[in-house]
Amino acid sequence: MRKRVLITGITGFLGSHLAKALLAHDYEVFALKRAASSLSRIESIINDINLYDIDDIDSLFRKCGKIDTIIHTATCYGRNNEKVSDVFAANIEFPLRLLEAGNHAGVETFLNADTTLNKYLNPYSLSKNQFLELGKFFSMRKKMRFWNVKLQYIYGPNDDPSKFSAYVINSCLENISELKLTKGEQKRDFIHIDDVISAYMCLLREVDNLNNSFVEFEVGTGHSISIREFVETVHRLTNSRTLLTFGSLPYRDGEVMQSKANTTALKALGWHCLNDFETALNMTIEQERVNI
């Protein structure tokens, strides 16, 4: 019998890739989306998925029957000057409603896409941390398995252009005159979207073999490089003429200077990162070059 998975954030970068992978592995895919969301990332699979409006959570479970797993990837970063209350509504209130409805409908597992950022860095990271605590609360009472997936820095083609990696790649491809940057000493664990998807598929394969009510997995390569090295590598691979001005921007208050995944738990399930940094980055650049 086909496993049935509900995805939030299906129109986003991570969610759309997940949906395509799930269909390729013969999962039945259901999804919640905002009424105004662009469907451009899922046009090729629109007839193969079951789409519901984000306001129809309760009716979704009544109409579609048993859902085995919820994969929650929808989020609000606050990049578009949203009010703090709007960020908290998107990152706490909405997934909490989903937890409650899913629990009532007998959903067995909730996979939560989480951040590695310091919880006090900004409203986004604080809201994600507070929802994590609510997820633990649910799992402690054996209401639903809550698996927290802490994602390092994901990159790949067709990402949100406002994200740092996409902005740097597109700026270098377009040869803008100057790219203003911090000193770039902070280190990040950059992982290609294909490896993130393979991690999720690994977790789904093991979901019935682990009895943990709460468990946390870190998804990354396990290695970090500096922001400066990332930018300079993009600059070299694109043969860009853009002037890189490191140190022209200040660090954010509370900036994380070192971040990399501890992949021990994932590797114990048989997962391994397959893409090396420069090869995956060059693949991303070449795919983005076509879009310019």
Residue ranges: model-predicted function:
Residues 38-49:
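Short, conserved SAM-binding/catalytic segment
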Residues 72, 76, 89, 93-126:
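Conserved Rossmann-fold NAD(P)-dependent oxidoreductase catalytic core, especially the SDR/UDP-sugar
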Residues 176, 180-292:
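C-terminal substrate-binding subdomain of Rossmann-fold SDR/epimerase-dehydratase oxidoreductases
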Residues 8, 32, 73-74, 110-115, ...:
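SDR active-site strand-loop-helix element
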Residues 53-90, 101:
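NAD(P)H-binding glycine-rich loop region in Rossmannoid oxidoreductase-like domains
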Residues 123-125, 129, 133-188, 193-204, ...:
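NAD(P)-dependent short-chain dehydrogenase/reductase
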Residues 27-37:
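Conserved glycine-rich Rossmann-like NAD(P)H-binding loop of the short-chain dehydrogenase/reductase
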Residues 5-25:
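N-terminal Rossmann NAD(P)H-binding glycine-rich loop of SDR-like oxidoreductase domains
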